[in-house]
C-alpha cells in the first residue's frame, strides 16, 4: 500500500474567519480519512486574508477528489485545492 504526501491550500471565506476552528475541523476530518502527520501553516494572501496550507500523509487508494471535497465543505472555507501530491517511499 503506497502513501502520498498532500499539501492542500484552504481559502477562508473572509479575513474574519476563525482559522483555528477551520484547522481543528480539518484535522478531525482528515483523521477520519486515515491521514497522519497533519500540520498547518498560515500563508498571507492579501488585505488581511490568510490561506491555510495543510500538509499530511494519507494512503494513496483514498484518492485526491475526496480530500478536496471534504475540506472544501468545512464551514467558512470557500475552496480547497491540492497544491502538491507526492508518492512516498519507505
Predicted regions and their residues:
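Long, contiguous binding/interaction regions
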Residues: 1-90
Amino acid at each position: 500500500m503506497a502513501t502520498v504526501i498532500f499539501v492542500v491550500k484552504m481559502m477562508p471565506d473572509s479575513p474574519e474567519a476563525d482559522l483555528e476552528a477551520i484547522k481543528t475541523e480539518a484535522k478531525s476530518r482528515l483523521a477520519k480519512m486515515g491521514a497522519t502527520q497533519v500540520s498547518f501553516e498560515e500563508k498571507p494572501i492579501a488585505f488581511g486574508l490568510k490561506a491555510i496550507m495543510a500538509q499530511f500523509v494519507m494512503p494513496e487508494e483514498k484518492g485526491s477528489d475526496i480530500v478536496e471535497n471534504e475540506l472544501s465543505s468545512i464551514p467558512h472555507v470557500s475552496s480547497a485545492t491540492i497544491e502538491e501530491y507526492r508518492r512516498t517511499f519507505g
